[in-house]
Amino acid sequence: MTRRRHGWQRPLHPLQIVGAVIYSVLVAAFYVFLGFFLGNRIAVIALLSVFSSVAVSVIVLFVRCTAIDPTDKTSAKKKRKDKSKGVLMKLRVKVVLSQVVVRFFRRLERKILRNFLRRTYLDPWKSSVQLEPLLPFPLVMKDDDSVTPDPKEEDDISYCSLCDLEVKRSSKHCRTCNRCVEGFDHHCRWLNNCVGKKNYTTFILLMVFVLLMLIIEGGTALAVFVRCFVDKKGMEMELKRRLYVEFPQWALATISIILVLFTAYGSAAMGQLFLFHVVLIRKGMRTYDYILAMKEENQFTEVDPFDELDSSSDESSDFDSPERLRPTFISKFMCRKANENQQRLSIKIEGDEQSPSSTLINKKPGFHVSINPWKLITLSSEKALQAAEKAKERLRKTKPVSGTEENSLKPLPLETKFGLLLDPDNNNTVLQPSTTAAVKLQVSPGRFSSPRRRFSGSSSSTVPSPKQKYRTNFDLKLTEVSRELESYISRQVLCSVIKQDGSEASPR
């Protein structure tokens, strides 16, 4: 699956197209049936001006929020920084040398003047003018990372095994977009894009202007509906003058009341979603934290109440695949489910396997996470964040050891230096959960892939014999020191198995 960069990248989501169609219908209905039938010229001009500006803002913010790429680019920035550091150092060396030479001659000139001319104003301790320091300015710059590295930046870096890249700790992996999003909040289907740190402000502004647009159109439709019964003659004359056809008033009244109901429903849904995000901002939380907190609360409802999360047990549970947000009846208008039968979110942090406990939780009847701002208001932010952290910690403990994680290990330092890794296209490997088979590689005997994953054998046998199998007791969750020890032991076993001529020997 390719990584998505923005929401306009194909394939487009159906809800994205539906949203554009609804917007076009609302704008066309306002200019054709509502805006010009208020009966007051000043009110018509003012209303058309306000609605036009709001409608243009909505489409601009929608395009911008969908086109923004919220991907975490920490790894790419580091690579660009490393490449540009050499060029900057060359330029800086030239500047430093030129300043050293200039200051040397200036100091020599001052010394000669002090010794022969005896000018007191040239003495640095008697002069009010502060002389330049001995060290050149580029060598003492505070913003240079090579001189004063920022320890907080290094502490904030994590590693995503799915992307195989270094990302920030606040970044999460979205399965729908197949990328890590910086400051991940949620994946919006109406935008066909993830909402994160880079486009969250645009998303909030988009909700505000959409809410204003719905309120203006709903109020105008209600005014036109009332006027159809209060001023029938004036409305009939204005219909002929504006539409140039005989348009019945009952049809206009029907269209108006439909627009009133539709905009009222949309305004309620949008208002609920906007209030939900306002409360999230006030509490310093994200939608993803809210989901994890609700799942944590549901999991320990029968064991410990939510008020006693400090004493909750560390029972193994999988939070890799949180369920999709199941909105309430009102909030279905925004970010609702595309398929009611699915109960998994479109986000995946790491791994595809689920533990038995998580399967039981997901199949638990009535278990869902809804967008409920009223429940969020009564929720303590400290306890919610604590529950979210516990869920994340449980996720790290229960992520699968085999499969994705094993294939996504970063190369060891020695492998990086000496080029021990082999092209994965030429690798014929048979992996088993408890045993690893010795299979001949279709390459020269002198080059091998990572010893942690595969061995080279003879070309005569494609099916390994029982003697060729050996136990693998390597724990992939060890520390970096244990990983180095694992690599050393693997290389020792490899040297004992492989002879110099490339033939196969039984492991000792």
Curated annotation (Swiss-Prot):
It is an enzyme of class 2 (transferase). Its EC number is 2.3.1.225. InterPro entries: Palmitoyltrfase_DHHC, PFA4/ZDH16/20/ERF2-like. It catalyses: L-cysteinyl-[protein] + hexadecanoyl-CoA = S-hexadecanoyl-L-cysteinyl-[protein] + CoA. One of its GO terms (cellular component) is cytoplasmic vesicle membrane. Keywords: Acyltransferase, Cytoplasmic vesicle, Endoplasmic reticulum, Lipoprotein, Membrane, Palmitate, Transferase, Transmembrane, Transmembrane helix. Residues 158-208 form the DHHC domain. The active site is at C188. It comes from the Eukaryota. One of its GO terms (molecular function) is protein-cysteine S-palmitoyltransferase activity. Belongs to the DHHC palmitoyltransferase family. S-acyltransferase involved in protein lipid modification. This is Protein S-acyltransferase 18. It comes from Arabidopsis thaliana (Mouse-ear cress).
